Amino acid sequence: LLLVVIGWFTFGAKVMKLRSEAKKLVAQSSEDTFKASQTSIVYDTNGKQLLKFKGEKDVYYLKYKELPVYVIAAVISVEDKNFYKHSGVDYKGISRAAVSYVVHKGRITQGGSTLTQQLAKTVFLNRQKTWKRKVKEIFMAVELEKKYSKEQILEFYLNNVYYANGYYGIQAASQGYFRKDAKNLTMSEAAFLSAIPNNPTIYDPRTNKENTIKRRNKILKDMYEQKLIRKDQYEEAINEEIKVKNAQKSKTEKKNYVETYVIHCATKEIMKQ
C-alpha cells in the first residue's frame, strides 16, 4: 500500500496533468486541424497541368469515400487489426510495451500503438520516446475516438502519415512513386505503399526497395490470413512487379512569367471577395 501511495504522489499528478492537456487539445481540434496546406495544381483550358505549388510538404487531401479500399485493408491488417474493435487503445499492446519499458530500464523499445495513437502522435505530438509522450498519446487516442468516427480517423491518418521522400498522405505517395491517383492503385501497390510508414527510412522505396517489397509481402499475407482478400487475389498481388518512378526534378527558376501571372490573377480574385 505504501508503494502505491508513493507511486501516486510521484507520477499521479503528472499523469492527471497529461490527461488534462490531452483532453484540451482534442476538444479544440476540428476537421481542419488534420488538413495541412495542400499542394495546388493549375491547369490550362484543355485540362493540361501548367504549374504545381507546394510548400515544404507535398500534400493532397482525400475524403474517406475517395480512399482506396485496398489501402484501408492493408493499413489495418498490418498496423491495427483490431481497429474497429477498440476505443483508441489496444491494452494488450500497451501491456507488452510496458513490460518492455521495465525490462529495458526506462527505454521505450515497443510501440503498441493503434492507428488512433499514431494519428495523435503525428498531428499533435513529437517523436520523442518518453513515458510522458506515450501517456499523453494514449489519452489523446481515447478522446479522438470519442469525438470522431472510425471513418474520420482513417481519413485523417491516411492524409497525414509520412511515406518518405517528402510525401505526406496516400495521394501524394501514389503520385510521387507511381504517377497515378490513389484510386487507381493496384492491390499490390497499395500494400507496397502501406509498408512505408512503419519506418520511412528502412522502407524507403527508392533507396531500400527490397525491404519495402518484403514488408509488402508480409502485408499481403496478413490480408489473406485475415480473410480480407481471396487466395487468387493474394497470389496475383504478390507476384506483381512493382515499378517505382524516379523523383521528379524541380524547376531551378523561382518563378517564370506564367507562374507570376497566375499568382497575380489569384490575388486579384481574393481581394474582390
PLM regions: where:
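Non-catalytic, structured segments within soluble enzyme domains
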Residues: 107-273
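Generic structural signal for well-ordered beta-strand positions
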Residues: 50-51, 230
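Extracellular/periplasmic catalytic domains that process cell-envelope and extracellular macromolecules
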Residues: 33-36, 42-43, 66-70, 147-149, ...
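N-terminal type II signal-anchor transmembrane helix
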Residues: 1-45, 50, 102
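Alpha-helical membrane-targeting segments
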Residues: 21-25, 82, 87, 91-106, ...
